[in-house]
């Protein structure tokens, strides 16, 4: 039994968070109360802690001891919200790490809770309602008093496994276990198991049954994609997977790995990769090597429905692990994320087309999913250190052909690209005797049965089993594991990893068997060697839980010491759990009970199961012709702009770090006004090359209601038109990932799936494209009982195509931002060829008018021809802007381009309207005069169809002098009849769309943009500080204040470090990181470029005495999330120095040395600010606290470099320029100084607006720092700290927007060159 010390912390909830809770309570009809809150810390130890340790704890936690914990009383109600009893929170793991590294002995664990006090009259039912408001039942408990908190530290006794009596009870015993355990076994699988266990003459253990269920779930084995199909009574010739494989068989060139690893690998290029060299004491060096591109896209739909934050977070984390575990280890690089949900029904912004059909109680509402889910995914990516650069967001919920169609079971998609050494792309054979290792976090009782649960229709499982199946994420420990993997593959041919898998569905019970089965081996495991963070888990829970942030891998015994040294340096847990055998048998030994919870041949677990047969028939949708003649076009335009699929996605984008790693070229935000309209994402392969990688997406699920195969072809087409304006070359260089969602088992849906796969396979082969990777989620149906009524919501067939390609030169990428140049025109290329089909369009959705024919990719040859022309124009720099047509049609394309360029448009659609009318009303067009045609209802309908159809196509901005040549290129490809010159830019802030002299739409662009951003604004208000959301919304149209610009007082192209570089002298710089830091590579690259000799220095190196700061002339503390920022940003890192006497002395000596420089950036800035007591000349320095928005802010912000003592900024003084910010706690706080800012503070960097004025206006000032403070320096200027990230934008190609004159270097290179000059 642990001794538990309670410590009282600071106020937990900000005023606006309290207000939001009170508003939610009022909406539930709860009585008015007063609410206060405070953090409490519970420190568990084997015996009472001495006074000195308690004093250190109080300083560490910013908390106080209490003689007696407070109690509830009449009229004052306590809700003590803690981590869920029986679990250990990620917060506790990291806080306990900090305590250990601060030398605090005897502490078992530190947990944090929040005491919420409600003053007022509440009955028991109302208390329960309040408890539900205050906690997340997935991860938290609500306790009635402080004494109960001791249960956080209760240790349960372990139990052995249980069995199912198949020998005695036969099949019926297994059928019963199937239901009780939520195994989702089919009748064939039950027969298979009964037959095999009877042959083995033994009963199965519960562990073996759970393991079998996970390993053979639809989620893991993709039985439907390998099934036989009988459609309309006829057996089909190929499986779904066979048709996907056909694409690769037809076009294998450029693909290195397909269908046989965690990710696909496609050919990249020989480049110089930058990373620390273990042979040179971790000195950063460039390494020339063949480097390939990893591509992977996953979905995490079921968990996101149940617990949006945790579901989306672990979805992102699982996909990252898939990339990292490819081959013998690789590096994830950039991510994508997408969400599809049912109608949002935002309070105070309910849209006229939204219908609320209700939902089951145990799943989250679409609005809650979109408030919490994106934060979960972004938080994981941010903390791990992967930029998220691409995505989509769609809502749909509507009655169609008698069924409610929608996404109560949402789509949450997570994917990305990575880099891998050519020599690491294939796993090696695991020899007998090889060690089998778990790397990463400990096991705990979460995510039990997730693979099986994800394979079931939502609502068919027991609600408690659904909750058990959701995992929780800890990205900081996944970062540590990735660092271990990086250190291994960076050894090249000496990489100790033989083979590696991520731990996902089924936990170790699926991962370890996969690892050895791939090598045709067996294995013996010791169950009690599995690292655990919970006591009392039984064998099933240990072996099958889906605790995240884990990998399994194999190494030779001779490499164990070297591997251990890598793990210890990175502070990453690992354990040798088993040994490979040559008998094909799987044995899991439990030494605690001297028995074997698992003991069976691998061919029973992963053997050839009875093949699935799917039988279905065609269910044709009802055909209703499209009519829109009586709809006001301007009203339609405004409705379409509010539909989430069309509307601005700011609220999804600015929460995600888009620059970490320093290799981002093109993110979602475009132009000097940072408008979220990019068609694709582009990254660079390295720090001294312009080669890169691109990715785009295509998805058209509403089209599938009308014509599923057409929707599949359109997805492929959209992915191509989205990526077309990147310098890729041959279309065959593009490779696709296909993620398939369907409600299989619902009548007609299996047939649609088959025909769509068939159509996509044929289209890809015709386009010279292949699909080397993909995934499926085929239980996209939600069922529940509402009183006497049985309800269901069935998702349309939903294919998501993600396209990946190597890029020749990232600088040639063309964006939708219109350029304000003289004599330019807009050309529209209509790949719908005038058909203007409206089925599944945004226009139809906002009027509940789901009718018409489906748009389609009718001619793959013409799409190839279009792509070829665009590629030539990109290569020849003939395109000024490019934007493809998709949701919202041509109207959305035009307004989005205008929003990005902040310019007016004068658009004449006369010829395009004529073509659309003639194509669809040939007889009328031949028999009537023009004026008679325009009086018809069919003409009004033609206007709507021309503006809002979503056929493939694109608008390009070109110089007038190039028009003839460009038309000729299209002529050569027989596309000239489908190219229209439609308009020009104007200086007015107006969008004019006309038919000759008749205005169809004439409206103010500011008003249109406010409408476009309304949905994002309202969600932001609900999620973040509403005052900040309102401030950002108010800036729309204020172009002067919100524009980016560059006013530098030096020659950007002059390298002032060159003389020092040429001298050959390279000062050594320590690139300092702590566990959880993720920005070290780009920091080292920037300083290396400026002539420094950069070394990777981990805090563990300093603690162990392997490295000493006295060996360096400069220290750079890097950005990231040290210890996950659990004790305040950078505070745990700083206190591990301040509380460690030897380290304290070492840092103090370094800071006092007049011949050294220090730079702290972001997390490093926060850390160094907390070391102010040992840094000379820092009187008045602030600490950095949570952003005013209470949200992570990732922006390209304007800053000014004022006159200061800073030596590294000396060469930049007086300059104003944009810089990346990415932080959640960047607000300079002067509470330690009574809120006063000292006159001689040493402000080194300030946020400004577009008029070069220091600003407090959000988001121009992204965190609310007073006087716009973004950085400070000490008195003699040797030590400078700043929240922005100059190291991520020292090259011009790293900037989302840059002025024309910046070519290779950006203005921020001067900071690094200035540091080199300052050292002489």
Swiss-Prot record:
Q: Where in this chain does the record put each Glutamine amidotransferase type-1 domain?
A: 1069-1320
Database matches in InterPro entries: Class_I_gatase-like, FGAR-AT_N, FGAR-AT_PurM_N-like, PurL_large, PurL_linker, PurM-like_C_dom, PurM-like_C_sf, PurM-like_N_sf
| One Gene Ontology MF term | phosphoribosylformylglycinamidine synthase activity
- Enzyme Commission designation: 6.3.5.3
What main location does UniProt list? cytoplasm
Q: Where is the active site?
A: 1162, 1285, 1287
- Annotated residues that bind ATP are located at 311-322, 678, 886
Compartment annotation: Cytoplasm
Which keywords fit this entry according to its UniProt record?
A: ATP-binding, Cytoplasm, Glutamine amidotransferase, Ligase, Magnesium, Metal-binding, Nucleotide-binding, Purine biosynthesis
Give the UniProt record's GO annotations in the biological process aspect.
'de novo' IMP biosynthetic process; purine nucleotide biosynthetic process
Q: Which GO terms describe its cellular component?
A: cytoplasm
Residues the record lists as binding Mg(2+): 679, 718, 722, 884
Name the pathway it acts in: Purine metabolism; IMP biosynthesis via de novo pathway; 5-amino-1-(5-phospho-D-ribosyl)imidazole from N(2)-formyl-N(1)-(5-phospho-D-ribosyl)glycinamide: step 1/2
The catalytic activity, as recorded, is: N(2)-formyl-N(1)-(5-phospho-beta-D-ribosyl)glycinamide + L-glutamine + ATP + H2O = 2-formamido-N(1)-(5-O-phospho-beta-D-ribosyl)acetamidine + L-glutamate + ADP + phosphate + H(+)
Q: What job does this protein perform?
A: Phosphoribosylformylglycinamidine synthase involved in the purines biosynthetic pathway. Catalyzes the ATP-dependent conversion of formylglycinamide ribonucleotide (FGAR) and glutamine to yield formylglycinamidine ribonucleotide (FGAM) and glutamate.
Q: How does it assemble?
A: Monomer.
Which family is annotated? In the N-terminal section; belongs to the FGAMS family.
Q: Which PANTHER family match?
A: PHOSPHORIBOSYLFORMYLGLYCINAMIDINE SYNTHASE (PTHR10099:SF1)
Q: What is this protein called?
A: Phosphoribosylformylglycinamidine synthase
Higher taxonomy = Bacteria, Pseudomonadati, Pseudomonadota, Betaproteobacteria, Neisseriales
